[in-house]
Amino acid sequence: MVSTTLSVSRMTFVWRAARPSLLNHSLRKMSYQEGKPEPAKQALKKSKLPLGRFDSLEDSPEEREPLQKFPDDVNPVTKEKGGPKGPEPTRYGDWERKGRCIDF
């Protein structure tokens, strides 16, 4: 029991004695590397998957203002004032717009 305690205290002493030299070594290494130019970073690889329907850019002009506004806010086909601005929403594929689902 006494020898185990003695060996543990010696290891602790050795570690504490070695710690400042490790710190100094790492600081010297960092200061030495500051003078060297950093290697050029490689660009991240792009995925090899094809672009899908939902992978389009969100900053495109179609996303900002997808449909033209009606003159005087009146639909020329239905003569409805303030109604929906786009095509018939019950067509297949038109139930979702910008991540929002239409619920009637």
Swiss-Prot record:
Stored InterPro entries: SDHF4
Keyword Mitochondrion in annotation: yes
Keyword rRNA processing: no
A GO molecular-function descriptor: enzyme activator activity
One GO CC annotation: mitochondrion
Entries under Pfam families matching the protein: DUF1674
Region annotation (Disordered) ranges: 29-104
PANTHER family per the UniProt record, alphabetical: SUCCINATE DEHYDROGENASE ASSEMBLY FACTOR 4, MITOCHONDRIAL (PTHR28524:SF3)
Function statement: Plays an essential role in the assembly of succinate dehydrogenase (SDH), an enzyme complex (also referred to as respiratory complex II) that is a component of both the tricarboxylic acid (TCA) cycle and the mitochondrial electron transport chain, and which couples the oxidation of succinate to fumarate with the reduction of ubiquinone (coenzyme Q) to ubiquinol. Binds to the flavoprotein subunit Sdha in its FAD-bound form, blocking the generation of excess reactive oxygen species (ROS) and facilitating its assembly with the iron-sulfur protein subunit Sdhb into the SDH catalytic dimer.
Subunit structure, as described in the record: Interacts with Sdha in its FAD-bound form.
Protein name per its UniProtKB record: Succinate dehydrogenase assembly factor 4, mitochondrial
